[in-house]
Amino acid sequence: MVTVIDTLARPRHPEKANRPETEVLRKPDWIRVKAPGSAGWSQTAEIVRANGLHTVCEEAGCPNIGECWEKKHATFMIMGDTCTRACAFCNVRTGMPEALDQGEPQKVGDAVAKLGLSHVVITSVDRDDLADGGAEHFARTIAAIRKASPGTTIEILTPDFLRKDGALEVVVAARPDVFNHNLETVPAKYLSVRPGARYFHSLRLLQKVKELDGSIFTKSGIMVGLGEERPEVLQLMDDLRSAEVDFITIGQYLQPTRKHHKVERFVTPDEFKAYETVAYAKGFLMVSASPLTRSSHHAGDDFEKLRAARVARLGRS
């Protein structure tokens, strides 16, 4: 995917302008993706454009966009295309966001219905400028999808709602099928990778979802290749299991630009397989670990596996 950006009129990452450029490592042979351009990709793009929507597939430069859009799978990014945070790994535009589009929930619902999605993932930028962090907008979007496409299961990937009292309760009350909030990396890397967030706040957020509604599946993802050590990843798994998180995703960090955090190393497929084995042994219902794993990749298929795993373990869906 190629994104054309008017860097003179509106810099995408103004906070990174004065950062030194970092070394970009050559990608290994196991990181190869299909270029977008199929008929399914074009139809998905047309529906997204017609409804004036944003997708994290495009904004974050996801390597799987060709595969997912060909299948008419898209992860909708609500509340605009501009984030109030400036994470060192992320390609989403940063700055002061515009006012919320109050018609967006309905537009998302309509797009889900037109695409005929059995499962949809809704994410957002961070909106620290809003009193509730966008919680009510999430709830309205979930309700709009339920109305427009009643058979669609809904997965949300939320910000951390840091210092937004009562926000999580609003989102959980809307009853998504899956609540995903990514830890992104191990705690020792937060200051350099995710400086606006707090590791234990994010962990507590996931734990509280289960306390509020135990029927909702919880999910979290991390990137590797940022300089973390294996014991740190294993401890993170233990932390997530202590918070009763059902599903963990582990993928390779890929550097968007030379101004972003560098890739310290490329984790091998065998190492990902080893992480998967350990994660299942620690009690996760579902694990996705591979170089190209992303939070929303194969989300629909993974949801069915997740539901089946809970039935097998607990006797309920």
Swiss-Prot record:
UniProt entry keywords in alphabetical sequence: 4Fe-4S, Cytoplasm, Iron, Iron-sulfur, Metal-binding, S-adenosyl-L-methionine, Transferase
Binding-site positions, [4Fe-4S] cluster 1: 57, 62, 68, 296
Pfam families in UniProt: Radical_SAM
Protein localization: Cytoplasm
Chief place where the protein resides: cytoplasm
Chain positions covered by the region annotation Disordered: 1-21
E.C. designation(s): 2.8.1.8
Gene3D superfamilies per the UniProt record, alphabetical: Aldolase class I (3.20.20.70)
HAMAP family: Lipoyl_synth
Descriptive protein name: Lipoyl synthase
Origin species: Xanthobacter autotrophicus (strain ATCC BAA-1158 / Py2)
